Amino acid sequence: MAAKVLKFSHEVLHAMSRGVEVLANAVKVTLGPKGRNVVLDKSFGAPTITKDGVSVAKEIELEDKFENMGAQMVKEVASRTSDDAGDGTTTATVLAQAILVEGIKAVIAGMNPMDLKRGIDKAVTAAVAELKKISKPCKDQKAIAQVGTISANSDKSIGDIIAEAMEKVGKEGVITVEDGSGLENALEVVEGMQFDRGYLSPYFINNQQNMSAELENPFILLVDKKISNIRELIPLLENVAKSGRPLLVIAEDIEGEALATLVVNNIRGVVKVAAVKAPGFGDRRKAMLQDIAVLTGGKVISEEVGLSLEAASLDDLGSAKRVVVTKDDTTIIDGSGDAGDIKNRVEQIRKEIENSSSDYDKEKLQERLAKLAGGVAVIKVGAATEVEMKEKKARVEDALHATRAAVEEGVVPGGGVALIRVLKSLDSVEVENEDQRVGVEIARRAMAYPLSQIVKNTGVQAAVVADKVLNHKDVNYGYNAATGEYGDMIEMGILDPTKVTRTALQNAASIAGLMITTECMVTEAPKKKEESMPGGGDMGGMGGMGGMGGMM
Protein backbone atom coordinates (compact mmCIF):
# COMPACT_ATOMS: atom_id res chain seq x y z
CA MET A 1 0.00 0.00 0.00
CA ALA A 2 1.34 3.45 -0.93
CA ALA A 3 2.46 5.83 1.82
CA LYS A 4 0.01 8.58 2.79
CA VAL A 5 0.38 12.25 3.71
CA LEU A 6 -1.95 13.78 6.31
CA LYS A 7 -2.91 17.35 7.17
CA PHE A 8 -4.88 18.49 10.20
CA SER A 9 -6.98 21.36 11.49
CA HIS A 10 -6.16 24.86 10.17
CA GLU A 11 -3.72 23.47 7.58
CA VAL A 12 -6.63 21.50 6.08
CA LEU A 13 -8.88 24.56 5.87
CA HIS A 14 -6.19 26.71 4.26
CA ALA A 15 -5.36 24.03 1.65
CA MET A 16 -9.02 23.49 0.75
CA SER A 17 -9.63 27.22 0.66
CA ARG A 18 -6.80 27.73 -1.85
CA GLY A 19 -8.21 25.03 -4.14
CA VAL A 20 -11.74 26.42 -3.93
CA GLU A 21 -10.40 29.93 -4.61
CA VAL A 22 -8.71 28.84 -7.86
CA LEU A 23 -11.76 26.98 -9.18
CA ALA A 24 -14.34 29.57 -8.08
CA ASN A 25 -12.32 32.49 -9.50
CA ALA A 26 -12.23 30.77 -12.90
CA VAL A 27 -15.96 30.00 -12.82
CA LYS A 28 -17.37 33.25 -11.41
CA VAL A 29 -16.08 35.47 -14.24
CA THR A 30 -18.86 33.91 -16.37
CA LEU A 31 -21.72 35.10 -14.10
CA GLY A 32 -24.36 37.50 -15.38
CA PRO A 33 -25.08 39.16 -18.76
CA LYS A 34 -21.70 40.92 -18.76
CA GLY A 35 -19.85 37.77 -17.67
CA ARG A 36 -16.67 36.96 -19.62
CA ASN A 37 -15.83 33.89 -21.68
CA VAL A 38 -13.41 31.18 -20.61
CA VAL A 39 -11.30 29.39 -23.25
CA LEU A 40 -10.68 25.69 -22.56
CA ASP A 41 -7.80 23.91 -24.27
CA LYS A 42 -8.65 20.50 -25.72
CA SER A 43 -6.16 17.71 -26.35
CA PHE A 44 -7.40 17.55 -29.96
CA GLY A 45 -9.30 19.98 -32.18
CA ALA A 46 -9.99 23.65 -31.61
CA PRO A 47 -10.26 25.07 -28.08
CA THR A 48 -13.76 25.42 -26.61
CA ILE A 49 -15.10 28.86 -25.70
CA THR A 50 -17.76 28.80 -22.98
CA LYS A 51 -19.73 30.86 -20.48
CA ASP A 52 -21.09 27.78 -18.76
CA GLY A 53 -19.89 27.45 -15.17
CA VAL A 54 -20.02 23.66 -14.97
CA SER A 55 -18.02 23.24 -18.22
CA VAL A 56 -15.24 25.40 -16.77
CA ALA A 57 -15.34 23.59 -13.40
CA LYS A 58 -15.08 20.16 -15.04
CA GLU A 59 -11.81 21.11 -16.76
CA ILE A 60 -9.98 22.08 -13.56
CA GLU A 61 -7.47 19.71 -11.90
CA LEU A 62 -4.83 21.13 -9.55
CA GLU A 63 -1.29 19.85 -9.02
CA ASP A 64 -1.34 20.05 -5.19
CA LYS A 65 -3.44 17.09 -4.04
CA PHE A 66 -4.84 18.81 -0.94
CA GLU A 67 -5.86 21.92 -2.89
CA ASN A 68 -7.30 19.67 -5.59
CA MET A 69 -9.57 17.96 -3.04
CA GLY A 70 -11.07 21.34 -2.19
CA ALA A 71 -11.55 22.18 -5.87
CA GLN A 72 -13.16 18.79 -6.57
CA MET A 73 -15.67 19.25 -3.75
CA VAL A 74 -16.84 22.56 -5.20
CA LYS A 75 -16.90 20.96 -8.65
CA GLU A 76 -19.39 18.52 -7.11
CA VAL A 77 -21.61 21.51 -6.15
CA ALA A 78 -21.67 22.71 -9.77
CA SER A 79 -22.28 19.21 -11.21
CA ARG A 80 -25.04 18.38 -8.77
CA THR A 81 -26.81 21.70 -9.40
CA SER A 82 -26.53 21.13 -13.15
CA ASP A 83 -28.01 17.61 -12.80
CA ASP A 84 -30.87 18.71 -10.53
CA ALA A 85 -31.90 22.00 -12.16
CA GLY A 86 -29.89 22.26 -15.39
CA ASP A 87 -28.60 25.75 -14.61
CA GLY A 88 -27.34 27.88 -11.70
CA THR A 89 -23.92 26.21 -11.61
CA THR A 90 -21.99 29.49 -11.37
CA THR A 91 -24.33 30.83 -8.66
CA ALA A 92 -23.84 27.60 -6.68
CA THR A 93 -20.04 27.87 -6.98
CA VAL A 94 -20.04 31.53 -5.87
CA LEU A 95 -22.28 30.68 -2.88
CA ALA A 96 -20.09 27.70 -1.87
CA GLN A 97 -16.95 29.86 -2.03
CA ALA A 98 -18.61 32.61 0.04
CA ILE A 99 -19.85 30.23 2.76
CA LEU A 100 -16.46 28.50 2.93
CA VAL A 101 -14.40 31.73 3.10
CA GLU A 102 -16.63 33.23 5.82
CA GLY A 103 -16.83 29.88 7.64
CA ILE A 104 -13.06 29.37 7.74
CA LYS A 105 -12.59 32.82 9.29
CA ALA A 106 -15.02 31.83 12.08
CA VAL A 107 -13.38 28.42 12.69
CA ILE A 108 -9.90 29.97 12.90
CA ALA A 109 -11.34 32.55 15.35
CA GLY A 110 -12.11 29.58 17.63
CA MET A 111 -15.79 28.85 16.98
CA ASN A 112 -17.31 25.36 16.98
CA PRO A 113 -17.51 24.10 13.35
CA MET A 114 -20.51 21.85 14.09
CA ASP A 115 -22.55 24.74 15.52
CA LEU A 116 -21.57 26.93 12.56
CA LYS A 117 -22.86 24.23 10.20
CA ARG A 118 -26.13 23.94 12.17
CA GLY A 119 -26.57 27.71 11.95
CA ILE A 120 -25.94 27.68 8.18
CA ASP A 121 -28.42 24.81 7.69
CA LYS A 122 -31.12 26.61 9.70
CA ALA A 123 -30.59 29.78 7.64
CA VAL A 124 -30.85 27.87 4.35
CA THR A 125 -34.07 26.12 5.44
CA ALA A 126 -35.63 29.52 6.29
CA ALA A 127 -34.40 31.06 3.01
CA VAL A 128 -35.81 28.19 0.90
CA ALA A 129 -39.22 28.52 2.59
CA GLU A 130 -39.20 32.28 1.85
CA LEU A 131 -38.13 31.64 -1.78
CA LYS A 132 -41.19 29.45 -2.27
CA LYS A 133 -43.39 32.27 -0.90
CA ILE A 134 -42.10 34.90 -3.35
CA SER A 135 -42.13 32.45 -6.29
CA LYS A 136 -44.65 33.11 -9.07
CA PRO A 137 -45.98 30.40 -11.41
CA CYS A 138 -44.51 30.41 -14.93
CA LYS A 139 -47.34 29.60 -17.32
CA ASP A 140 -47.40 31.92 -20.33
CA GLN A 141 -45.15 31.74 -23.37
CA LYS A 142 -43.64 35.19 -22.70
CA ALA A 143 -42.35 34.21 -19.23
CA ILE A 144 -40.96 30.92 -20.59
CA ALA A 145 -39.14 32.84 -23.36
CA GLN A 146 -37.67 35.26 -20.78
CA VAL A 147 -36.34 32.43 -18.60
CA GLY A 148 -34.80 30.73 -21.66
CA THR A 149 -33.22 34.01 -22.78
CA ILE A 150 -31.60 34.67 -19.37
CA SER A 151 -30.28 31.11 -19.11
CA ALA A 152 -28.86 31.25 -22.65
CA ASN A 153 -26.76 34.27 -21.62
CA SER A 154 -29.25 36.85 -22.89
CA ASP A 155 -29.69 35.28 -26.37
CA LYS A 156 -33.31 36.15 -27.19
CA SER A 157 -33.49 33.87 -30.25
CA ILE A 158 -32.84 30.81 -28.04
CA GLY A 159 -35.46 31.86 -25.46
CA ASP A 160 -38.08 32.40 -28.18
CA ILE A 161 -37.48 29.09 -29.96
CA ILE A 162 -37.69 27.13 -26.67
CA ALA A 163 -40.96 28.88 -25.74
CA GLU A 164 -42.36 28.08 -29.20
CA ALA A 165 -41.30 24.43 -28.89
CA MET A 166 -42.92 24.14 -25.44
CA GLU A 167 -46.13 25.69 -26.72
CA LYS A 168 -46.30 23.21 -29.60
CA VAL A 169 -45.54 19.96 -27.77
CA GLY A 170 -46.79 20.87 -24.30
CA LYS A 171 -44.93 20.89 -21.00
CA GLU A 172 -44.53 17.09 -21.08
CA GLY A 173 -43.39 16.91 -24.71
CA VAL A 174 -39.87 15.85 -25.62
CA ILE A 175 -37.65 18.64 -26.94
CA THR A 176 -34.33 17.50 -28.37
CA VAL A 177 -31.38 19.60 -29.52
CA GLU A 178 -29.45 18.72 -32.69
CA ASP A 179 -26.83 20.29 -34.96
CA GLY A 180 -28.49 22.32 -37.71
CA SER A 181 -27.22 22.81 -41.25
CA GLY A 182 -27.85 26.56 -41.63
CA LEU A 183 -26.79 29.71 -39.78
CA GLU A 184 -30.13 30.24 -38.01
CA ASN A 185 -31.82 28.15 -35.31
CA ALA A 186 -34.80 26.16 -36.64
CA LEU A 187 -37.65 24.24 -35.02
CA GLU A 188 -39.18 21.01 -36.33
CA VAL A 189 -42.26 19.54 -34.67
CA VAL A 190 -43.51 15.97 -35.06
CA GLU A 191 -47.24 15.68 -34.41
CA GLY A 192 -48.73 12.56 -32.86
CA MET A 193 -46.79 9.47 -31.90
CA GLN A 194 -43.70 8.70 -33.92
CA PHE A 195 -41.45 5.66 -33.58
CA ASP A 196 -38.33 4.68 -35.49
CA ARG A 197 -39.56 1.76 -37.60
CA GLY A 198 -40.29 2.10 -41.33
CA TYR A 199 -42.24 -0.04 -43.83
CA LEU A 200 -41.18 -3.68 -44.27
CA SER A 201 -41.53 -3.52 -48.05
CA PRO A 202 -41.28 -0.60 -50.50
CA TYR A 203 -44.39 -2.06 -52.24
CA PHE A 204 -46.50 -0.49 -49.48
CA ILE A 205 -45.64 3.04 -50.75
CA ASN A 206 -48.66 4.91 -52.12
CA ASN A 207 -47.27 8.45 -52.19
CA GLN A 208 -44.44 8.40 -54.74
CA GLN A 209 -43.59 12.06 -54.16
CA ASN A 210 -42.70 11.60 -50.46
CA MET A 211 -41.84 7.90 -50.83
CA SER A 212 -44.25 7.09 -48.00
CA ALA A 213 -47.30 4.96 -47.26
CA GLU A 214 -50.16 7.23 -46.14
CA LEU A 215 -53.29 5.67 -44.66
CA GLU A 216 -56.42 7.74 -43.93
CA ASN A 217 -58.63 6.58 -41.03
CA PRO A 218 -56.96 3.13 -40.84
CA PHE A 219 -57.52 0.19 -38.53
CA ILE A 220 -54.37 -0.63 -36.52
CA LEU A 221 -53.51 -4.25 -35.67
CA LEU A 222 -50.99 -4.72 -32.83
CA VAL A 223 -49.38 -8.16 -32.48
CA ASP A 224 -46.77 -9.17 -29.91
CA LYS A 225 -45.18 -11.98 -31.99
CA LYS A 226 -43.78 -12.84 -35.41
CA ILE A 227 -46.31 -13.38 -38.19
CA SER A 228 -45.16 -15.79 -40.87
CA ASN A 229 -48.27 -17.92 -41.43
CA ILE A 230 -50.89 -16.10 -43.52
CA ARG A 231 -53.72 -18.43 -42.38
CA GLU A 232 -53.77 -16.64 -39.02
CA LEU A 233 -54.36 -13.30 -40.73
CA ILE A 234 -56.94 -14.24 -43.40
CA PRO A 235 -60.17 -13.97 -41.31
CA LEU A 236 -59.20 -10.50 -40.10
CA LEU A 237 -58.06 -9.34 -43.56
CA GLU A 238 -61.42 -10.36 -45.04
CA ASN A 239 -63.31 -8.35 -42.42
CA VAL A 240 -61.09 -5.29 -42.99
CA ALA A 241 -61.57 -5.59 -46.79
CA LYS A 242 -65.37 -5.62 -46.29
CA SER A 243 -65.18 -2.43 -44.18
CA GLY A 244 -63.31 -0.63 -46.98
CA ARG A 245 -60.83 0.94 -44.56
CA PRO A 246 -57.01 0.63 -44.77
CA LEU A 247 -54.98 -1.44 -42.27
CA LEU A 248 -51.67 -0.84 -40.48
CA VAL A 249 -50.05 -3.98 -39.04
CA ILE A 250 -47.51 -3.51 -36.23
CA ALA A 251 -45.88 -6.80 -35.16
CA GLU A 252 -42.59 -8.12 -33.81
CA ASP A 253 -41.83 -9.14 -37.40
CA ILE A 254 -43.74 -10.10 -40.54
CA GLU A 255 -42.00 -12.42 -42.97
CA GLY A 256 -42.40 -15.09 -45.63
CA GLU A 257 -45.83 -15.74 -47.12
CA ALA A 258 -47.56 -13.41 -44.64
CA LEU A 259 -45.60 -10.40 -45.92
CA ALA A 260 -45.95 -11.54 -49.56
CA THR A 261 -49.75 -11.87 -49.21
CA LEU A 262 -50.07 -8.40 -47.67
CA VAL A 263 -47.98 -6.91 -50.51
CA VAL A 264 -50.08 -8.69 -53.20
CA ASN A 265 -53.37 -7.56 -51.61
CA ASN A 266 -52.06 -3.99 -51.43
CA ILE A 267 -50.90 -3.92 -55.07
CA ARG A 268 -54.20 -5.38 -56.33
CA GLY A 269 -56.17 -2.90 -54.24
CA VAL A 270 -58.08 -5.63 -52.36
CA VAL A 271 -57.14 -3.96 -49.07
CA LYS A 272 -54.89 -0.93 -48.62
CA VAL A 273 -52.28 -2.07 -46.11
CA ALA A 274 -48.86 -1.26 -44.62
CA ALA A 275 -46.77 -3.35 -42.23
CA VAL A 276 -44.04 -2.26 -39.81
CA LYS A 277 -41.99 -3.85 -37.03
CA ALA A 278 -42.90 -2.96 -33.44
CA PRO A 279 -40.57 -0.38 -31.84
CA GLY A 280 -38.11 -1.25 -29.05
CA PHE A 281 -36.85 -4.60 -27.77
CA GLY A 282 -37.88 -7.06 -25.04
CA ASP A 283 -39.96 -5.62 -22.22
CA ARG A 284 -39.70 -2.12 -23.67
CA ARG A 285 -41.32 -3.37 -26.89
CA LYS A 286 -44.27 -4.77 -24.92
CA ALA A 287 -44.66 -1.49 -23.06
CA MET A 288 -44.53 0.56 -26.29
CA LEU A 289 -47.09 -1.69 -28.00
CA GLN A 290 -49.36 -1.16 -25.00
CA ASP A 291 -48.81 2.63 -25.32
CA ILE A 292 -49.89 2.48 -28.98
CA ALA A 293 -52.91 0.35 -27.99
CA VAL A 294 -54.00 2.94 -25.40
CA LEU A 295 -53.45 5.79 -27.88
CA THR A 296 -55.45 4.12 -30.68
CA GLY A 297 -58.11 2.39 -28.58
CA GLY A 298 -57.08 -1.13 -29.60
CA LYS A 299 -55.74 -4.27 -27.92
CA VAL A 300 -52.34 -5.93 -28.17
CA ILE A 301 -52.93 -9.43 -29.60
CA SER A 302 -50.71 -11.49 -27.33
CA GLU A 303 -50.86 -15.15 -26.31
CA GLU A 304 -49.77 -14.06 -22.82
CA VAL A 305 -53.23 -12.55 -22.25
CA GLY A 306 -55.09 -15.30 -24.13
CA LEU A 307 -55.74 -13.42 -27.39
CA SER A 308 -54.98 -15.19 -30.67
CA LEU A 309 -54.68 -13.71 -34.15
CA GLU A 310 -57.21 -16.15 -35.71
CA ALA A 311 -59.89 -15.15 -33.21
CA ALA A 312 -59.24 -11.38 -33.46
CA SER A 313 -62.15 -9.23 -34.63
CA LEU A 314 -62.46 -5.61 -35.77
CA ASP A 315 -63.30 -4.66 -32.16
CA ASP A 316 -59.75 -5.62 -31.14
CA LEU A 317 -58.20 -3.18 -33.63
CA GLY A 318 -57.23 0.39 -32.85
CA SER A 319 -57.74 3.28 -35.25
CA ALA A 320 -56.38 6.74 -35.98
CA LYS A 321 -57.21 9.72 -38.16
CA ARG A 322 -54.06 9.29 -40.24
CA VAL A 323 -50.87 7.23 -40.37
CA VAL A 324 -47.72 8.09 -42.33
CA VAL A 325 -45.04 5.39 -42.80
CA THR A 326 -41.67 6.29 -44.35
CA LYS A 327 -38.51 4.24 -44.89
CA ASP A 328 -37.28 5.05 -41.35
CA ASP A 329 -40.27 5.90 -39.17
CA THR A 330 -44.00 5.64 -38.55
CA THR A 331 -46.21 8.48 -37.30
CA ILE A 332 -49.69 7.88 -35.88
CA ILE A 333 -51.70 11.12 -35.91
CA ASP A 334 -54.79 11.64 -33.75
CA GLY A 335 -55.33 8.13 -32.36
CA SER A 336 -58.91 7.41 -31.29
CA GLY A 337 -58.07 6.10 -27.80
CA ASP A 338 -60.12 7.08 -24.76
CA ALA A 339 -58.83 10.33 -23.17
CA GLY A 340 -59.25 8.88 -19.65
CA ASP A 341 -57.22 5.77 -20.50
CA ILE A 342 -54.46 7.90 -22.03
CA LYS A 343 -54.37 10.08 -18.89
CA ASN A 344 -54.11 7.00 -16.64
CA ARG A 345 -51.31 5.60 -18.79
CA VAL A 346 -49.44 8.93 -18.60
CA GLU A 347 -49.77 8.91 -14.79
CA GLN A 348 -48.48 5.32 -14.66
CA ILE A 349 -45.39 6.24 -16.72
CA ARG A 350 -44.82 9.30 -14.50
CA LYS A 351 -44.75 7.09 -11.42
CA GLU A 352 -42.28 4.75 -13.15
CA ILE A 353 -40.03 7.76 -13.86
CA GLU A 354 -40.15 8.77 -10.18
CA ASN A 355 -39.24 5.24 -9.05
CA SER A 356 -36.51 4.66 -11.64
CA SER A 357 -32.88 5.04 -10.53
CA SER A 358 -31.26 4.66 -13.97
CA ASP A 359 -30.79 7.81 -16.07
CA TYR A 360 -31.11 5.74 -19.28
CA ASP A 361 -34.44 4.24 -18.18
CA LYS A 362 -35.68 7.66 -17.11
CA GLU A 363 -34.83 9.10 -20.53
CA LYS A 364 -36.65 6.28 -22.35
CA LEU A 365 -39.70 6.60 -20.08
CA GLN A 366 -39.68 10.37 -20.64
CA GLU A 367 -39.75 9.74 -24.41
CA ARG A 368 -42.71 7.38 -24.03
CA LEU A 369 -44.48 9.94 -21.87
CA ALA A 370 -43.95 12.67 -24.46
CA LYS A 371 -45.23 10.51 -27.30
CA LEU A 372 -48.44 9.87 -25.38
CA ALA A 373 -48.92 13.33 -23.85
CA GLY A 374 -47.71 15.80 -26.43
CA GLY A 375 -45.30 15.24 -29.24
CA VAL A 376 -41.66 15.71 -30.14
CA ALA A 377 -39.93 18.97 -31.08
CA VAL A 378 -36.40 19.17 -32.48
CA ILE A 379 -34.42 22.40 -32.13
CA LYS A 380 -31.77 22.55 -34.86
CA VAL A 381 -28.97 24.86 -33.75
CA GLY A 382 -27.46 27.01 -36.50
CA ALA A 383 -23.93 28.47 -36.39
CA ALA A 384 -21.13 29.60 -38.70
CA THR A 385 -18.33 27.43 -37.26
CA GLU A 386 -18.03 24.19 -35.32
CA VAL A 387 -16.63 25.98 -32.24
CA GLU A 388 -19.64 28.33 -32.21
CA MET A 389 -22.00 25.39 -32.79
CA LYS A 390 -20.67 23.51 -29.72
CA GLU A 391 -20.92 26.60 -27.50
CA LYS A 392 -24.41 27.52 -28.75
CA LYS A 393 -25.70 23.96 -28.42
CA ALA A 394 -24.56 23.82 -24.79
CA ARG A 395 -26.38 27.10 -24.12
CA VAL A 396 -29.59 25.82 -25.73
CA GLU A 397 -29.48 22.66 -23.60
CA ASP A 398 -28.93 24.76 -20.44
CA ALA A 399 -31.78 27.09 -21.32
CA LEU A 400 -34.06 24.12 -21.98
CA HIS A 401 -33.36 22.68 -18.51
CA ALA A 402 -33.93 26.09 -16.93
CA THR A 403 -37.30 26.61 -18.63
CA ARG A 404 -38.42 23.12 -17.55
CA ALA A 405 -37.40 24.01 -13.98
CA ALA A 406 -39.36 27.29 -14.24
CA VAL A 407 -42.51 25.51 -15.39
CA GLU A 408 -42.09 23.01 -12.54
CA GLU A 409 -41.59 25.33 -9.54
CA GLY A 410 -42.23 28.87 -10.83
CA VAL A 411 -39.93 31.90 -11.11
CA VAL A 412 -38.38 34.51 -8.82
CA PRO A 413 -36.75 37.88 -9.69
CA GLY A 414 -33.37 37.21 -11.34
CA GLY A 415 -30.00 38.92 -11.15
CA GLY A 416 -29.27 37.68 -7.60
CA VAL A 417 -32.24 39.72 -6.26
CA ALA A 418 -34.25 36.73 -4.97
CA LEU A 419 -31.47 35.77 -2.53
CA ILE A 420 -31.31 39.38 -1.27
CA ARG A 421 -35.10 39.39 -0.73
CA VAL A 422 -35.09 36.26 1.43
CA LEU A 423 -32.50 37.70 3.85
CA LYS A 424 -35.25 39.20 6.04
CA SER A 425 -36.50 35.66 6.81
CA LEU A 426 -33.18 34.97 8.58
CA ASP A 427 -34.05 37.51 11.32
CA SER A 428 -36.56 35.09 12.83
CA VAL A 429 -34.32 31.97 12.79
CA GLU A 430 -34.08 30.49 16.30
CA VAL A 431 -30.54 29.60 17.40
CA GLU A 432 -29.26 27.79 20.49
CA ASN A 433 -25.96 29.62 20.98
CA GLU A 434 -23.68 32.37 19.68
CA ASP A 435 -21.81 30.07 17.26
CA GLN A 436 -25.07 29.10 15.53
CA ARG A 437 -25.96 32.79 15.27
CA VAL A 438 -22.62 33.35 13.49
CA GLY A 439 -23.54 30.44 11.16
CA VAL A 440 -26.76 32.27 10.23
CA GLU A 441 -24.75 35.47 9.60
CA ILE A 442 -22.31 33.52 7.37
CA ALA A 443 -25.26 32.37 5.23
CA ARG A 444 -26.64 35.95 5.21
CA ARG A 445 -23.36 37.40 3.88
CA ALA A 446 -22.96 34.57 1.34
CA MET A 447 -26.43 35.15 -0.14
CA ALA A 448 -25.46 38.70 -1.12
CA TYR A 449 -22.40 37.41 -3.07
CA PRO A 450 -24.12 36.44 -6.38
CA LEU A 451 -25.59 39.96 -6.85
CA SER A 452 -22.21 41.54 -6.01
CA GLN A 453 -20.41 39.25 -8.48
CA ILE A 454 -22.90 39.98 -11.31
CA VAL A 455 -22.40 43.72 -10.72
CA LYS A 456 -18.61 43.33 -10.40
CA ASN A 457 -18.50 41.60 -13.80
CA THR A 458 -20.11 44.71 -15.35
CA GLY A 459 -17.36 46.93 -13.89
CA VAL A 460 -19.67 48.87 -11.52
CA GLN A 461 -19.12 49.38 -7.76
CA ALA A 462 -20.86 46.33 -6.23
CA ALA A 463 -21.37 47.69 -2.69
CA VAL A 464 -23.38 50.71 -3.92
CA VAL A 465 -25.75 48.58 -6.02
CA ALA A 466 -26.22 45.91 -3.33
CA ASP A 467 -27.06 48.57 -0.74
CA LYS A 468 -29.61 50.27 -3.01
CA VAL A 469 -31.34 46.96 -3.86
CA LEU A 470 -31.34 45.76 -0.24
CA ASN A 471 -32.97 48.93 1.11
CA HIS A 472 -35.79 49.05 -1.45
CA LYS A 473 -39.25 47.93 -0.33
CA ASP A 474 -40.43 46.31 -3.60
CA VAL A 475 -39.68 42.54 -3.75
CA ASN A 476 -39.01 42.63 -7.51
CA TYR A 477 -36.78 45.74 -7.46
CA GLY A 478 -33.27 45.06 -8.68
CA TYR A 479 -30.39 46.03 -10.96
CA ASN A 480 -30.41 45.14 -14.65
CA ALA A 481 -26.73 44.42 -15.29
CA ALA A 482 -27.25 44.30 -19.07
CA THR A 483 -28.52 47.92 -19.31
CA GLY A 484 -27.32 49.42 -16.01
CA GLU A 485 -30.88 50.38 -14.98
CA TYR A 486 -32.77 49.80 -11.73
CA GLY A 487 -36.40 48.62 -11.79
CA ASP A 488 -38.89 45.76 -11.55
CA MET A 489 -36.91 42.63 -12.54
CA ILE A 490 -40.03 40.62 -13.48
CA GLU A 491 -41.27 43.41 -15.81
CA MET A 492 -37.80 43.72 -17.37
CA GLY A 493 -37.94 39.97 -18.07
CA ILE A 494 -35.05 39.08 -15.75
CA LEU A 495 -36.29 35.88 -14.13
CA ASP A 496 -34.67 32.87 -12.49
CA PRO A 497 -36.45 29.54 -12.04
CA THR A 498 -37.16 29.05 -8.31
CA LYS A 499 -35.81 25.50 -8.57
CA VAL A 500 -32.44 26.76 -9.89
CA THR A 501 -31.97 29.32 -7.09
CA ARG A 502 -33.15 26.85 -4.44
CA THR A 503 -30.93 23.99 -5.67
CA ALA A 504 -27.87 26.26 -5.96
CA LEU A 505 -28.30 27.47 -2.37
CA GLN A 506 -28.98 24.02 -0.88
CA ASN A 507 -26.10 22.28 -2.69
CA ALA A 508 -23.62 25.08 -1.92
CA ALA A 509 -24.53 25.08 1.79
CA SER A 510 -24.40 21.29 1.95
CA ILE A 511 -20.86 20.92 0.55
CA ALA A 512 -19.44 24.10 2.14
CA GLY A 513 -20.83 22.95 5.52
CA LEU A 514 -19.01 19.63 5.14
CA MET A 515 -15.78 21.41 4.25
CA ILE A 516 -15.95 23.72 7.29
CA THR A 517 -16.33 20.67 9.56
CA THR A 518 -13.37 18.82 8.01
CA GLU A 519 -10.53 18.23 10.50
CA CYS A 520 -8.17 15.92 8.58
CA MET A 521 -7.20 15.22 4.95
CA VAL A 522 -5.42 12.10 3.71
CA THR A 523 -3.81 11.68 0.31
CA GLU A 524 -1.12 9.52 -1.30
CA ALA A 525 2.44 10.73 -0.84
CA PRO A 526 4.02 11.91 -4.10
CA LYS A 527 6.32 9.24 -5.51
CA LYS A 528 10.01 10.01 -5.20
CA LYS A 529 11.91 9.85 -8.45
CA GLU A 530 14.03 6.70 -8.53
CA GLU A 531 17.75 7.44 -8.32
CA SER A 532 19.46 6.82 -11.63
CA MET A 533 22.36 4.33 -11.70
CA PRO A 534 25.70 5.87 -10.71
CA GLY A 535 27.84 7.08 -13.64
CA GLY A 536 29.85 4.18 -15.10
CA GLY A 537 33.17 5.31 -13.55
CA ASP A 538 34.54 1.81 -12.79
CA MET A 539 34.07 0.82 -16.43
CA GLY A 540 37.42 2.54 -16.91
CA GLY A 541 39.16 -0.71 -15.89
CA MET A 542 38.01 -2.19 -19.17
CA GLY A 543 40.59 -0.10 -20.96
CA GLY A 544 42.95 -3.08 -20.66
CA MET A 545 40.80 -4.84 -23.23
CA GLY A 546 42.84 -3.05 -25.86
CA GLY A 547 45.44 -5.81 -25.39
CA MET A 548 42.94 -8.26 -26.80
CA GLY A 549 44.03 -7.17 -30.23
CA GLY A 550 46.92 -9.67 -29.88
CA MET A 551 44.42 -12.52 -29.92
CA MET A 552 43.89 -12.13 -33.62
UniProtKB/Swiss-Prot annotation:
InterPro entries: Chaperonin_Cpn60_CS, Cpn60/GroEL, Cpn60/GroEL/TCP-1, GroEL-like_apical_dom_sf, GROEL-like_equatorial_sf, TCP-1-like_intermed_sf. ATP binds at residues 30-33, 51, 87-91, 415, 480-482, 496. One of its GO terms (molecular function) is ATP-dependent protein folding chaperone. One of its GO terms (biological process) is protein refolding. One of its GO terms (cellular component) is GroEL-GroES complex. Forms a cylinder of 14 subunits composed of two heptameric rings stacked back-to-back. Interacts with the co-chaperonin GroES. The keyword NADP does not apply. Pfam families: Cpn60_TCP1 (PF00118). It is an enzyme of class 5 (isomerase). Its EC number is 5.6.1.7. Keywords: ATP-binding, Chaperone, Cytoplasm, Isomerase, Nucleotide-binding, Stress response. It catalyses: ATP + H2O + a folded polypeptide = ADP + phosphate + an unfolded polypeptide. Together with its co-chaperonin GroES, plays an essential role in assisting protein folding. The GroEL-GroES system forms a nano-cage that allows encapsulation of the non-native substrate proteins and provides a physical environment optimized to promote and accelerate protein folding. This is Chaperonin GroEL. Belongs to the chaperonin (HSP60) family. It comes from the Bacteria. It is found in: Cytoplasm.
